[in-house]
């Protein structure tokens, strides 16, 4: 009886090379792949099967992100609801969020891109009635006593959410936090295209490229205790920015 192979892909890692080969032969796997946070071991590159390689379009290049901090990926956050007890209220923006994952965007004008809402009346508070205190990362609001208020604001994703999830779940210790970058931004878009082309040319042994971590797929936002605070598996919550909003509005205007 002829031994059949195919339709089975085995994940692998650097410390299970021999076991991977044994299972490949035993189960008749026709492909091997690396996993998130790992790379295909060199010892497996000559195995007579297809090779799948994970490729990250929006992370795993901290040098680029550090050189272009204004093009790091962003998302909108909403502060805690806070009740005013006088005619002035200060809301701490990052309270309840993990500061290793998120950083307040102080580069773009808060009065243009943020919103303060009186949750008791449902009305948007005039930009003349609040100020952002950059050094304290607080918003100071002229308030009506005993009304509830929130602030919606932009924050940079300074730790990729999927990498953070894997870091916490797998209890990684010494792995550097991976920064994000936004492929809609002009410099990053050009850089990412050139980098992908170069990677394909330098890795002819790879048969299938597994693209992963697209920010339009899901959102993972963690609280200050590294617990999942907000999770959305189908949406665009973590792929917003002034640039993307401006492009969207321009497209809507031209469509009409």
Task: Tell me the role of every PLM-derived stretch.
Residues 1-198, 202-206:
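Mature N-terminal, pre-catalytic/accessory segment of carbohydrate-active enzymes
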Residues 38-39, 214-217:
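Short, solvent-exposed loop/turn segments at secondary-structure junctions
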Residues 48, 69-70, 223-232:
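Short secondary-structure boundary/capping segments
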Residues 60-64, 216-221:
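Short catalytic/ligand-binding loop motif for oxyanion handling, primarily in non-cytosolic enzymes
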Residues 246-253:
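Conserved small/polar residues in nucleotide/adenosyl-binding loops
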């Amino acid at each position: 009886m002829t031994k059949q192979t195919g339709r089975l892909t085995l994940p692998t890692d650097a410390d299970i090379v021999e076991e991977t080969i044994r299972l490949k032969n035993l189960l008749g796997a026709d492909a091997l792949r690396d996993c998130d946070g790992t790379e295909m071991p060199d010892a497996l590159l000559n195995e007579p099967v297809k090779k799948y390689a994970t490729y990250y379009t929006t992370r795993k290049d901290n040098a680029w992100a550090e050189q272009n901090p204004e093009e790091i990926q962003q998302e909108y956050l909403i502060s805690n609801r806070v009740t005013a007890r006088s005619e002035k209220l200060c809301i701490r923006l990052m309270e309840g969020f993990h500061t290793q994952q998120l950083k307040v965007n102080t580069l773009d004008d808060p009065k243009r891109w943020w919103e303060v809402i009186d949750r008791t009346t449902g009305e948007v508070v005039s930009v003349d009635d609040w100020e952002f205190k950059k050094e304290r990362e607080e918003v100071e609001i002229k308030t009506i006593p005993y009304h509830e208020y929130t602030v919606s604001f932009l924050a940079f994703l300074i730790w990729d959410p999927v990498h953070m999830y894997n870091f916490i779940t797998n209890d990684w210790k010494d792995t550097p936090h991976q920064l994000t970058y936004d492929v809609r931004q002009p410099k990053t878009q050009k850089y990412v295209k050139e980098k992908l082309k170069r990677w394909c040319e330098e890795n002819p042994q790879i048969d299938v490229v597994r693209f992963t971590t697209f920010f339009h797929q899901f959102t993972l936002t963690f609280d200050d205790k590294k617990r999942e605070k907000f999770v959305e598996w189908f949406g665009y919550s973590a792929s917003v920015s002034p640039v993307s909003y401006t492009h969207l509005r321009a497209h809507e205007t031209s469509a009409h």
